[in-house]
Amino acid sequence: MSEKLYPVLPEAKKNTLIDNETYLEWYEESMSDPDGFWAKHGRRIDWFKPFTKVKNTDFNGDVTIKWYEDGVTNVSYNCIDRHLKSRGDKVAIIWEGDNPYIDKKITYRELYENVCRMANVLKKHGVKKGDRVTIYLPMIPEAAYAMLACARIGAVHSVVFAGFSPEALAGRIVDCESTFVITADEGVRGGKPVALKENTDTAIDIAAKQYVMVNKVLVVRRTGGKVSWGRGRDLWYHQEVASVEPHCEPEPMNAEDPLFILYTSGSTGKPKGVLHTTGGYLVYASMTHQYVFDYHDGEIYWCTADVGWVTGHSYIVYGPLANGATTLMFEGVPNFPDQGRFWEVVDKHHVNIFYTAPTALRALMGAGDEFVTRSSRSTLRLLGSVGEPINPEAWEWYYNVVGDQKCPIVDTWWQTENGGILITPLPGATDLKPGSATRPFFGVKPVLVDNEGNVQEGVADGNLCISDSWPGQMRTVYGDHKRFIETYFSTYKGMYFSGDGCRRDEDGYYWITGRVDDVLNISGHRLGTAEIESALVSHHSVSEAAVVGYPHPIKGQGIYCYVTLMTGADAQDPDELRKELVQHVRKEIGPIATPDKIQFAPGLPKTRSGKIMRRILRKIAEDEFGALGDTSTLADPGVVDDLIENRQNKK
């Protein structure tokens, strides 16, 4: 753990919405009087019919979660219509294309017309309240229009990341029995086309074999690339929207009506359809967006995620737009045309708040500082991190090099299931420790539990649970409430189990140590892989590291490290560097963490969202590379061949 403490910056304190005193006061109120607290903050969104009930939740038995259950509202209305009077001409979405010379600005009034037209197209083709619509689009404005159009008419959207394979798309279409798909001819990423329409056609054929028939496909023309056409089924978006009205009344929605399904992989079985509902989700997404990012009217906010992930739902679309913010959507990748792209976009659009993932930061850090320092980044005020624990070395680089020591970093912990950020610093209230997500957001009760279910008090290590509900929490697994209870509420009775390990320090700060299934047991000692990875990455030659366990004849599990080197570091003698890294880890953590195998690799197997696929790394480490399972979601499947070829553990 990093011992360094970074006090709240004077500049952040000066203009903040929440200082430390306010944080402590509000947090105490949210614990002692959740009904009163959430009633007050529930009014941050507009209700067609105000709620009289606030919290009705039970983590035992059949697990019911209801918030604002008698209130009536509409998410699309809250994200668009209510802003038209005061900020109709304000930019709602800045779209930055994959090509650095292409961008577009969409005002709230233009957003209204685009969303209403798309909503009317859906209605024209028979989509009704409660129907599931699958959205398989690249990061273009139409992705946001599609989500908001579904919300407007009460259809439930299921966004599938445009990097997923036809098989993955088909599985998601089948699971929620979706009959309407919105896609594009092609996507563009890093200058290369992605065959979305072709993938959609394949997925529809696969779904049909499982008796789910897609009736209509709305196709956005992104590249003008050639596509095959299903007569009577396929529709051009640009033709359809031209023939409908730019006005559509928002459907009155009960607070507990479904808003969206988003599939997330579990440790077992097929992906789970995480179901989020209307009222509580929007209250929580908008409130966390405002206070975690200390958002002030007029600022330019950029979350680099994709709408195919929950971060894109909550912090590109719903949270920012509910707050009347200007949100930036980026179609491209961090390293195209080169590794300076993020910072050039920051300068070009005068970005004030920047929210990205540690995996991107580590890759950019490995490319060298000059890609960062050639930009001014003078408009940046706040930096954020999401998706996985950020190792202290990447945190320090982000703070010192990207932020020039003038931007607080909000290292946020949350999950698809949570709807919004649960543990996080607040920039004007929280002293920072590199690598720590620090303190819980309002209304969030973290509990550390040992493997026997005993609650750990004070300084402790344990399994991270949340002991009471918050408005943004998922309500069920779509079509499988039993799986919902088994996955999240059966391990520790009466608590939501996150699946993550965590440490609480003497200041009450929380340190996420990685998935509990990523914990190694070395000679009877528990070690989080994140700790070993962090130690490796703190070495000046290492850009990125992933650590897994493998069967060891003496210790039970051995430590197998995959290491990607900094540019230029591969000139060293590999055996010498291995010895150096072993000593470095021993020094950082202790002899118990001595790596057994270190394999140098040009890249790690990652999904297109940047998550490292540890399952594949485990199999290679165990020499079971015949059983790698599905590798179709990998960004670069060629990486796997290199890993197998050069594995350190050949039998």
Curated annotation (Swiss-Prot):
PROSITE patterns: AMP_BINDING. It comes from the Bacteria. The keyword Cell division does not apply. Acetylated. Deacetylation by the SIR2-homolog deacetylase activates the enzyme. GO terms for cellular component: cytosol. Pfam families: ACAS_N, AMP-binding, AMP-binding_C. The modification N6-acetyllysine is found at K611. It catalyses: acetate + ATP + CoA = acetyl-CoA + AMP + diphosphate. Keywords: Acetylation, ATP-binding, Ligase, Magnesium, Metal-binding, Nucleotide-binding. Its EC number is 6.2.1.1. ATP binds at G387, E388, P389, D411, T412, W413, W414, Q415, T416, D500, R515, R526. CoA binds at R189, G190, G191, K192, T311, N335, S523, R586. GO terms for biological process: acetyl-CoA biosynthetic process from acetate. Transmembrane segments: none annotated. Mg(2+) binds at V537, H539, V542. InterPro entries: Ac_CoA_lig, ACAS_N, AMP-bd_C, AMP-bd_C_sf, AMP-binding_CS, AMP-dep_synth/lig_dom, ANL_N_sf. GO terms for molecular function: acetate-CoA ligase activity; AMP binding; ATP binding; metal ion binding. Its cofactor is Mg(2+). The keyword Phosphoprotein does not apply. Catalyzes the conversion of acetate into acetyl-CoA (AcCoA), an essential intermediate at the junction of anabolic and catabolic pathways. AcsA undergoes a two-step reaction. In the first half reaction, AcsA combines acetate with ATP to form acetyl-adenylate (AcAMP) intermediate. In the second half reaction, it can then transfer the acetyl group from AcAMP to the sulfhydryl group of CoA, forming the product AcCoA. Belongs to the ATP-dependent AMP-binding enzyme family. This is Acetyl-coenzyme A synthetase.
